[in-house]
């Protein structure tokens, strides 16, 4: 016999109130409600998209475990937003399942056959804010999406980290897939292309590798600058590019620098990359940054006073990723501590990056090593001792914050760690410090020391 939904959710709340900290429970769990249990799936409502995304990312497994303990069997969890409308339909890909057994998934949930690969649903043209800094890149991307393989082939998107290159590339993919659901649209990072090539060589399956990539109708390749020094990968990519281009298939490439500035890039590849259109994306101006924040707030159903928007936009000028990250930190901080959204209240959690000077990796390593009483060799080593691992994770986070180094380069500074290790460390520290005042204070103190070191080195 099924438990009434009110009783089930009440028991879930009792369990989670014990497991989670009070600010976390009050902010993210207590504000949600259970809508219904249908087809072995629990539908949960949240007050806004930000809360939904936060629960989905950090607490969905905790909720699922609690429900499973109460009911005695695993259930799917579907999180939606309270908008006054009944949830009449949800798809399998929107439901999180604790059980990996396919037989436990309700047959009534439809299966989807996606032709695209690794495309983020948020990266569409309608969510891209156009400004003077990216107008040409946006127009070219839209033209390519509407008529692939024609005027701009290849399209080479060039710009610094976090300026919207990946957004535009994936928007092209989404646009083409909507028009042509049967098209083969491949989005791949240069690192993934290289890894696939290495796997093909190891498994003696080069023919399958070539057939796979050369069957694309649209090939979207991110971070092409990582072809640097990879001679055999450059060789294979050259022939893949030629095959697609000669067949009239669209190729879109993104890089943090123009083709002629990528070290050790083969001249013939540089020539091919330059034969279409190179569209440069610059840093957004103040008006564009404010528009980006306003758009992000509207998408997440967040009310932002104009002075808060202007404060964040004025202090975070480097790139969009940094800008949106500042907004997320501010909203999380305000939500957790139950404060009104004002400039005064968000200032403690937002250290204006414009007051910082670019720090050297060596300076960051030294500051972190001194603070945690470990050696730089410890930070670069492979020790899993708790205190060393913690210091290493904080070091990676700070290096991400205080330098423009890519994730692989940061990994190299820490003794050749994989970029996925850097991502994990940065995500972990970001998640923890938003609800931990002690950690937030430690990070601010370390940042101050890094900034002081940078100033002394400059003077």
Curated annotation (Swiss-Prot):
Residues 73-117 are annotated as: Domain II. Residues 1-73 are annotated as: Domain I, interacts with DnaA modulators. One of its GO terms (molecular function) is lipid binding. ATP binds at residues 162, 164-166. Residues 335-459 are annotated as: Domain IV, binds dsDNA. Disulfide bonds: none annotated. Its main location: cytoplasm. SUPFAM superfamilies: P-loop containing nucleoside triphosphate hydrolases, TrpR-like. The keyword Cytoplasm applies. Pfam families: Bac_DnaA, Bac_DnaA_C, DnaA_N. Residues 118-334 are annotated as: Domain III, AAA+ region. Plays an essential role in the initiation and regulation of chromosomal replication. ATP-DnaA binds to the origin of replication (oriC) to initiate formation of the DNA replication initiation complex once per cell cycle. Binds the DnaA box (a 9 base pair repeat at the origin) and separates the double-stranded (ds)DNA. Forms a right-handed helical filament on oriC DNA; dsDNA binds to the exterior of the filament while single-stranded (ss)DNA is stabiized in the filament's interior. Belongs to the DnaA family. Domain I is involved in oligomerization and binding regulators, domain II is flexibile and of varying length in different bacteria, domain III forms the AAA+ region, while domain IV binds dsDNA. This is Chromosomal replication initiator protein DnaA. It comes from Nostoc punctiforme (strain ATCC 29133 / PCC 73102). The lineage of its organism: Bacteria, Bacillati, Cyanobacteriota, Cyanophyceae, Nostocales. The gene is dnaA.
């Amino acid at each position: 016999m099924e438990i009434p939904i009110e009783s089930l959710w009440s028991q879930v709340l009792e369990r989670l109130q014990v497991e989670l900290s009070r600010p976390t429970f009050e902010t993210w769990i207590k504000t949600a409600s259970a809508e219904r249990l249908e087809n072995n799936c629990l539908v949960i409502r949240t007050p806004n998209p930000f809360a939904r995304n936060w629960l989905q990312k950090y607490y969905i497994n905790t909720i699922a475990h609690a429900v499973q303990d109460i009911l005695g069997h695993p259930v799917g969890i579907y999180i939606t937003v309270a908008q006054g409308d009944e949830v009449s339909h949800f798809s399998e890909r929107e439901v999180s399942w604790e059980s990996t057994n396919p037989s436990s998934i309700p047959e009534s949930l439809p299966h989807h056959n996606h032709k695209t690969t690794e495309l983020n649903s948020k990266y569409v043209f309608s969510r891209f804010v156009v400004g003077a800094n990216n107008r040409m890149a946006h127009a070219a991307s839209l033209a390519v999406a509407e008529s692939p393989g024609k005027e701009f082939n290849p399209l080479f998107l060039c710009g610094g980290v976090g300026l919207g290159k990946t957004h535009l590339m994936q928007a092209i993919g989404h646009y083409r897939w909507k028009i042509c659901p049967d098209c083969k649209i491949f989005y791949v990072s240069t690192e993934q292309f290289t890894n696939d090539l290495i796997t093909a060589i190891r498994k003696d399956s080069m023919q399958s590798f070539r057939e796979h990539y050369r069957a694309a109708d649209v090939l979207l390749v991110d971070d092409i600058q990582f072809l640097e020094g990879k001679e055999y990968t450059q060789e294979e990519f050259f022939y893949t590019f030629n095959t697609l281009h000669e067949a009239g298939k669209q190729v879109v490439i993104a890089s943090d620098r123009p083709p002629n500035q990528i070290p050790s890039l083969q001249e013939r590849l540089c020539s091919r990359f330059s034969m279409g259109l190179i569209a440069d994306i610059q840093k957004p101006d103040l008006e564009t940054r404010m528009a980006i924040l306003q758009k992000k707030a509207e998408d997440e159903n967040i009310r932002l006073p104009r002075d808060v928007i202007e404060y964040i936009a004025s202090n975070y000028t480097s790139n969009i990723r940094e800008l949106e990250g500042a907004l997320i930190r501010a909203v999380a901080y305000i939500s957790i501590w139950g404060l009104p959204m004002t400039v005064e209240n968000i200032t403690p959690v937002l250290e204006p990056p414009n007051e910082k000077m670019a720090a050297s990796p060596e300076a960051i390593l030294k500051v972190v090593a001194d603070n945690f009483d470990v050696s730089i060799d410890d930070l670069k080593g492979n020790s899993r001792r708790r205190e060393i691992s913690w210091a290493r994770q904080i070091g990676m986070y700070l290096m991400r914050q205080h330098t423009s180094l890519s994730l692989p380069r940061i990994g190299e500074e820490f003794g050749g760690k994989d970029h996925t290790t850097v991502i994990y460390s940065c995500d972990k520290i970001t998640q923890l410090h938003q609800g931990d005042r002690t950690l937030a204070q430690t990070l601010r103190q370390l940042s101050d020391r890094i900034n002081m070191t940078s100033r002394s080195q400059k003077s």
